[in-house]
Every structure is written in C-alpha cells, then in structure tokens.
C-alpha cells in the first residue's frame, strides 16, 4: 500500500473513532481519573472496572480534538480484558511510538497504529497521550 493510501486509511480510522467513539460514557463504582491538557483544552474522564488484576471495562467522556478523543476510544477498546501489567505495557508502547522511540512492534496495536503519524507533530503528542496518561494514573493508583 502506498504511503498516501496508508495515510488516508489512518485518517479515516481516526475520524471514525472521533465521530463514533467506542466506550463513551461513565461507569459507576469504578476507578475514575480526570485529566486535562491546559495547552489546548482537551479534557477526559476515564472510568474503569478493574477486578482480579484485569481491566474488565473502560469508558471515557470528554471534550477535545479528533486526536485526543479518537485515542481515548482506541485505548478503551485495546485495554478491555487485559491484565493491568499488559495494559501498562501497551501504554508504554504507545508512549514510545508517540515519542518516535523504538518500540515492540510484535504486539498488534490494531487501530492504535493509525495514530503513529502524530509523532511528526510535537504539539499534538499531548493530545494523543492524554487518555493513556489517565489509564496509567488509574491503574497505578488502583494497585
């Protein structure tokens, strides 16, 4: 697939998650994390049910750009059913990808790969990582 076709596909995936967010909403009696990006105004509330060391459910609500909201949608899909350690590993891989670092590409990132081009735009990295930082905070505080 040519670079332009791949770029177009990634853009479509991002916009699909933005316009049709997965796992949008709030879970009652859950781990709750509120974060915002004061630079651009993005904000997210992440709620998760974690039982026996596994992320059973994850939902988010927020306001922000297409990158921050689609990243939150992708993240909630990716971490459901994962052990805490696996979810944190996925977050580390995503962070490394955003920072242009080497990362373990043996793990299938699914739709998350659509965000890899964000690393070319340093001002947008905080948008893409906001939900992931909420995930890390919630999982680390919930231990």
Positions of the model-derived regions?
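Short, thiol/selenol-centered motifs that function as redox-active sites or metal-ligating centers
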Residues: 62-71
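C-terminal binding/interaction regions
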Residues: 1-28, 82-143
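Secondary-structure capping and boundary motifs in well-ordered enzyme cores
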Residues: 40, 67, 120-124
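Structured beta-strand/loop patches that form or line metal/cofactor-binding pockets in enzymes
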Residues: 24-57
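Basic/polar, acidic-poor N-terminal "presequence/leader" segments
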Residues: 1-11, 46, 55-58, 63
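Alpha-helical support elements that line or immediately flank enzyme active sites
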Residues: 71-83
